[in-house]
Amino acid sequence: MRSGVRLGIDVGTVRIGVSCSDLHGTLATPYETVARSGDAADRRRIAEIVTDLGVVEIIVGLPLALSGVHTASTADAVAFAEALVVEVGAPVRLVDERLSTVSAHSALRSSGKNAKSSRPVVDQAAATIILQHALDAERATSRPPGHPVEPRIGP
């Protein structure tokens, strides 16, 4: 298992959930919810987090349909990841995130949280689930999870 803090990202249309791992890449924990902006302010905030925590890699959830096909949300997450890799200068990987938000909602309901007041927390919980899944997959296979994001060159 590679060492270093990793960041988990759940890209939504309104909010971005952020989670982080411990230095050994064992445990993911919720970190912050960043408001999604039409400009680069959201990516700049994530870049600040990367610097503050000394992040070595970012895991972005790739929202696929249950059948595995790409959706509008998939395209949005890929575009965000491609812009993020340019902004932060740290490696970014896309990892399948099917059902992470559903799992986060379920876990929060089980803990007694109501849906409306826990929306920002749901995003962090989904990011935590995405990151923990990636950490567990790497530990099981000894390979980095998902696939790397390359910066987009040109239009």
UniProtKB/Swiss-Prot annotation:
Per the record, the similarity remark reads: Belongs to the YqgF nuclease family.
Q: Name one Pfam family in it.
A: RuvX
Q: Which EC class is this protein assigned?
A: hydrolase
Q: What is its EC number?
A: 3.1.-.-
Q: From what organism does this protein derive?
A: Leifsonia xyli subsp. xyli (strain CTCB07)
At the top level, the lineage of the source is: Bacteria
Q: Principal place where this protein is found?
A: cytoplasm
Q: Which InterPro entries match?
A: RNaseH-like_sf, YqgF, YqgF/RNaseH-like_dom, YqgF/RNaseH-like_dom_sf
State the Gene Ontology BP annotations. rRNA 5'-end processing
Keyword ATP-binding listed:
no
What this protein is called in its record is Putative pre-16S rRNA nuclease
What keyword terms does UniProt attach to this protein?
Answer: Cytoplasm, Hydrolase, Nuclease, Ribosome biogenesis
A cellular component term (GO) from this record?
Answer: cytosol
Molecular function per GO: nuclease activity
Q: Where in the cell is it found?
A: Cytoplasm
Residue ranges of the region described as Disordered: 136-155
Purpose: Could be a nuclease involved in processing of the 5'-end of pre-16S rRNA.
Q: Which NCBIfam families match?
A: RNAse_H_YqgF
